[in-house]
Amino acid sequence: MSDGTGVPAAAALPPAASHRAQLRAEVLDGLKITFPFMVGAAPFGVIFGALATAQGLHPLETASLSLFVFSGSAQFVAISLLALGAGGWTIWLATLILNLRHTLYAAALVPYVRHLSLPWRFVLSAGLTDETFAAMEDRYRRLGKHELSHWAYLTSVVSMYLNWNFWTALGIFAGSQVKGLE
């Protein structure tokens, strides 16, 4: 017998179980759509960690850049400008201009996150990268938004953040083992 949805009544999940199943599906899909970007970012994280320490940044400074800036392109620009002897304001302005593209990314995603609370929007915007934008914009375009779709977005953000910082740490370690990287 069906409950009117086409799903046999015996197979229908209770609301809480259905919610958990949908949440799990969102998290898994967030990982699935982000994984190719994680693979692509890995060598750049290693290179950044190795080059930054080779340029004279302390390993904690290098790790802090990845932890708090979390913008590979800005981080590479920053270490390049540091190597050239640029001042702090020059580095700040260059990385700000470079990252202005994120305002366009954010504007494109507003229709999908507008309904979320301010704390949710803050966390998602703080983790907005080229990769998370590409993954989520494509997903939202294909599937639209629904009650739990922001969990796929959060999974994309967290997985890219952890991925970038893991590979940066590996690069810091590897860079300390290889001489002549300057």
Segments the model singles out, each with a brief description of its role:
Residues Q55, Q75-V77, Y140:
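Generic alpha-helical propensity signal that fires on short helical segments
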Residues V46-L51, V77, A135, A169, ...:
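Alpha-helical transmembrane segments of multipass membrane proteins
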Residues S71, G85-G88, R114-H115, L143:
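Residues in and immediately flanking transmembrane alpha helices
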Residues M1-V69, S80-T95:
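Helix-loop-helix hairpins and the membrane-proximal interhelical loops
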Residues H19, L93-L181:
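Helix-loop-helix junctions within the multi-pass membrane cores of secondary transporters/permeases
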Residues F70-I79, H102:
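A generic, lipid-embedded transmembrane alpha helix
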